[in-house]
Amino acid sequence: STVDASLYNLLVYVDDASSENSQSYSFPTLYRLSKDKRGNVTKEIIREYKEQVSTDPSVMQEVMKRAFTEYPAESYGLVVWSHGEGWIPSPLPIVKNASTRWIGQDGGHYLNITDMVSVFEAVGCHLDFILFDACFGQSIEVAYELRNNVSYIIGSPTEIPGPGASYDKVVPAMFASENVGVKVGKAYYLSLIHISEPTRRTPI
């Protein structure tokens, strides 16, 4: 399916895992993706940042405020593509070596769900959907934390395949004219069920 770029905006914030000293390093950048007349994907740089911890709530807040201010819309959705372990905050000093639960990782720094809620409330946004393209992104606890900020939460209570979703299938659903959350959920599920075992182990 095609998406009319004149009606919608697809913004992507990228902070890759390479170190500042590596040849492949690039600064954290906010892009706007679209297609040219030939159907080729193009990316426009909206803002290039200095090196920063992208899981810091203040960083997420600045990026979201910029996106909403410069590209206002009738509705919004969010995709979080990263690692994840769910809901219990990180760090967890009470029990040594216990697994913590979080969504989003930048080196040794993590974004807790409660921090994400604080960002949404500071920005003043209500999302049509949030897609956690990350392991352990869906649970009753996560849904409860986000109940006042998001209409639909899409994710997996277990691991997901390493590459994540097939965005050629998911992106058109993100810009559906109605039932966006339902359509994103279906597109995400369908993009994963065709992956052959043993990689596929992802309830949605």
Q: What residues fall within each predicted segment?
A:
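Structured segments of extracytoplasmic/periplasmic soluble domains
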Residues: 2-3, 63-70, 119-123, 146-149, ...
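Catalytic cores of nucleophile-dependent amide-cleaving enzymes
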Residues: 75, 79-88, 94-165
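Extracytoplasmic/secreted proteins, especially bacterial periplasmic and envelope-associated proteins
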Residues: 55-66, 115-118, 138-141, 145-148, ...
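Short, surface-exposed amphipathic charged segments that create phosphate/polyanion-binding patches used
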Residues: 167-175
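A conserved active-site cap/scaffold subdomain adjacent to cofactor or substrate pockets
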Residues: 177-191
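Single conserved hydrophobic/aromatic residue that forms the stacking wall/gate
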Residues: 193-204
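Divalent cation-coordinating acidic motifs and surrounding scaffolds
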Residues: 1-79, 84, 88-117
